[in-house]
């Protein structure tokens, strides 16, 4: 370990990563298949988007998902606009989804 490098706590490191992700991936368009979809009583939706090469967790908060017009189901092909974020307490990278539509519907 280099002596000139500061020793970070896990929380400090996660916050730094979260900040970097938020700056670098402020807006992304992503397509994929919905899996593990769950709508909670709070109104928030939690799901994963996946393709043949990987998957990423997603959250869509109530204020945004009220504008979607349909309830996604596992297996749906969708396109989302989102920002990349990290849930700092667990170190999980996720998409915070701002809009969602069925894939191939145009815009």
Please annotate each region the language model reported.
Residues 1-107:
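Acidic, two-metal ion nucleic-acid-processing modules in DNA metabolism proteins
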